[in-house]
Amino acid sequence: MSKVYDTLGNLKVGSFIVIDGEPCRIVEMSRAKTGKHGSAKANVVAIGLFSKAKKTLVAPVDTQVEVPVIEKHVGQIIADMGTMYQVMDMETYETFEVEKDSIEEDIRNKLGVGSEVEYWVVMGKRLIIRPR
């Protein structure tokens, strides 16, 4: 299971949400009551984990939204293959590839062959978060 459901009103800045099929981190959130008989609305601004694109969502606070399940693991970079890193999981010894473009610039500068990294598995995709 890579997603669960939660009420939009329960989420806070720093939480994760799925908008347009992409997992995102909430960077700004505001709530407003629309009038005497209207329900409160939430305005969510989020940044995509993989595309780094800004996404917005305006919906009632009692709306059920998808929240991605994030699995955190430790791995080691075993090869630099130009546009990708080959990473080995430190628990299962499984190897996989991660695109360098999905890693932030300042983190990418600290990485090299033999570096231990923390990576997340989000909705079936892997993302290197930080060196250990």
UniProtKB/Swiss-Prot annotation:
Hypusine found at: K36
SMART domains (alphabetical): eIF-5a
Main location (coarse class): cytoplasm
Source taxon at top rank: Archaea
UniProt keyword Transmembrane helix, yes or no: no
Entry GO CC: cytoplasm
Subcellular location: Cytoplasm
GO molecular function: ribosome binding; RNA binding; translation elongation factor activity; translation initiation factor activity
Keyword Cytoplasm: yes
Keywords in alphabetical order: Cytoplasm, Hypusine, Initiation factor, Protein biosynthesis
An example Gene Ontology biological process: positive regulation of translational termination
Family recorded in the similarity comment: Belongs to the eIF-5A family.
Function summary: Functions by promoting the formation of the first peptide bond.
Identification of the protein by name: Translation initiation factor 5A
Organism in which the protein naturally occurs: Desulfurococcus amylolyticus (strain DSM 18924 / JCM 16383 / VKM B-2413 / 1221n)
